[in-house]
A protein has these predicted regions:
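Alpha-helical metal-binding/catalytic segments enriched in His/Glu/Asp
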Residues: 58-59
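Extended beta-strand/beta-hairpin segments
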Residues: 1-53, 64-149
Length: 149
């Protein structure tokens, strides 16, 4: 079994219909998630958008970390993430591909020095590499009666 680095907890509570308030264990801020139009009201990002955003954000932050360690100056950092929802073999929706385009705003003088950084950072992105490898997801559904609170 791999060595544990950190464990975290995220809680979700239904607001109404498909809207859920997401609470992160170490943050005061919450996030409202919802289903897209046709199912939900599109009041917040949906789970597939959050997964794509997590991949893009992790890659972007990892690139910034590597650039700083290499002493590279970034004039800006931008990312564009495009995900495609497709029908899987069983006919159910699945994320078929997540495409991430990064623009780190490298200074002309740093272009050559940046090569090693740009070739290595991707492997250190925990979210991207976990998604690529497949994640062990374990689901348990409580079967006790609700008290209605």
């Amino acid at each position: 079994m791999p060595d544990l680095i950190k464990e975290f907890k995220i809680e979700m509570e239904q607001v109404k219909d498909y809207e859920f308030l997401v609470k992160f264990d170490d943050l005061a801020e919450t996030l409202l998630m919802d289903a897209p139009p046709g199912v939900g009201r599109n009041a917040g990002p949906c789970p597939t958008q959050m997964l794509a955003a997590a991949v893009g954000n992790c890659l972007t932050m990892t690139l910034v970390l590597f650039a700083r360690k290499a002493g590279l100056q970034l004039t800006h950092v931008r990312a564009a993430v495009k995900a495609r929802l497709v029908r899987g073999e069983n006919g159910l929706p699945r994320i078929g591909v997540i495409q991430v385009e990064l623009d780190p705003g490298l200074a002309e003088a740093d272009q050559e020095r940046a090569a090693a950084c740009l070739n290595a950072f991707e492997n250190y992105c925990a979210v991207t590499e976990s998604v690529r490898a497949g994640i062990d997801v374990r689901v348990a559904v409580s079967r006790h009666a609700s008290a209605g609170n």
